[in-house]
Amino acid sequence: MTQTTAAVICGEKDIQLRTFELPSISADELLVKNISNSVCLSTYKAALLGSKHKRVPENIDEVPVITGHEYAGVIVEVGENLKDQFKAGDSFVLQPAMGLPTGYSAGYSYETFGGNATYSIIPKIAIDLGCVLPYDGSYYADASLAEPMSCIIGAFHASYHTTQFVYEHEMGIKEGGTLALLACAGPMGIGAIDYAINGPVKPRRIVVTDIDEDRLSRAESLIPVSAAKAQGIELIYVNTIEMEDPVTYLKSLNDDQGYDDVMVYAAVAQVLEQADALLGNDGCLNFFAGPTDKEFKVPFNFYNVHYESTHIVGTSGGSTGDMVESLELSAQGDINPSFMITHVGGLQAAPHTILNQLDIPGGKKLIYPHIDLPLTAIDNFASLAEQDPFFSELDAILAKNNYVWNQHAEKALLEFYDVSLSV
């Protein structure tokens, strides 16, 4: 039997670190060593609601569930019936969207299946559904971030357009069209900007809005206007915080026309109303952000639905194909999901990080379950140099890369904490 330590949901707003023995795996299961897990806002929502959340079981006070679903690692033990599919020592990345009628998924619903743990067991149902993907790379953060990137990619694929009297949807954002990304300078927004510029379908103009100047400045430093121009795309960053009439201004950037595609990255009524007003003929509003209020409602212009063919779509999660696309684009160097990461920590940081996501500034938080490190901003490792000179070395690695987390930094960190990637 293998001992694991995990961050588990025990009740509403109650996440604890617990150490316990994992059962022996069955012939149809995998025992895995979790190397990295990126923290998702959806986990905060599950922790906030506890058993009131659709994906969280009723009996978590007796059988807590492991948090975390954006994870990657190394296979330690393979069930007898799976030895023709997997082998110990192989790296994997989890695709958590199983699509079960119950909504159950890794990181929400299982006692032994989740990312914020040193070891976990991947059950038969996840394996049968093809949710364990081989990972040929050696940068585990990239693998973890394939899940959030798949959500972004899935949203771009789910948007659609129409031709009058042709009764087929043309899936995806409009090639050569105009794209407005609203409230889009947060971590997922940065991933969306990156994909919009470097993905397979390219608009001719992208306008990114936010109300936080620091976030906009960071987004522009990571993805400059010149990078978009090299792809034949006009990229414009806009802070709308003090604008009396942002809709008129944003339309003025688009030849006084509405946009072909508008994506919304915050569940804020005012932003959605702006999005509706920004739609052009056959414009698609993609509501990416997930609200927590089940009664969240916003007025929508149905005159334009009828006469201008405006329409709306929303997605939650991404498919296996979306995840594979993310891994391929990352491996080719076309996109860099690590732009989203601003903090790194060990497993002991997971409970506080999950429960306080809304109050911790920055982007994605990355947990390495086998290291002993408080949650640390990646531009602040120099402050730990008094504890150990290694952190000065790590800061130097990051400084050379515009303080973007990267494979070199990950390798150095795992080696410092003696994290073995072999079994």
Curated annotation (Swiss-Prot):
Q: What induces it?
A: Induced by mannitol.
Name the cofactor(s): Zn(2+)
Which residues are listed for Zn(2+) binding in this entry?
40, 69-70
MF terms in GO? mannitol-1-phosphate 5-dehydrogenase activity; metal ion binding
List the effects observed when the gene is inactivated: Deletion mutant cannot grow in minimal medium. Mutant fails to persist in the squid.
The record's section on Pfam families has: ADH_N, ADH_zinc_N
Entry keywords, A to Z: Metal-binding, NAD, Oxidoreductase, Zinc
| EC main group | oxidoreductase
InterPro entries associated with the record: ADH-like_C, ADH-like_N, GroES-like_sf, NAD(P)-bd_dom_sf, Zn_alcohol_dh
Question: Which E.C. number(s) belong to this protein?
Answer: 1.1.1.17
Q: Which reaction does it catalyse?
A: D-mannitol 1-phosphate + NAD(+) = beta-D-fructose 6-phosphate + NADH + H(+)
Family affiliation:
Belongs to the zinc-containing alcohol dehydrogenase family.
Q: Which PANTHER family match?
A: L-THREONINE 3-DEHYDROGENASE (PTHR43401:SF2)
Q: What does this protein do?
A: Seems to be involved in mannitol utilization. Complements an E.coli mtlD deletion mutant.
Specify the protein name: Mannitol-1-phosphate 5-dehydrogenase
Question: Which gene produces this protein?
Answer: yggP
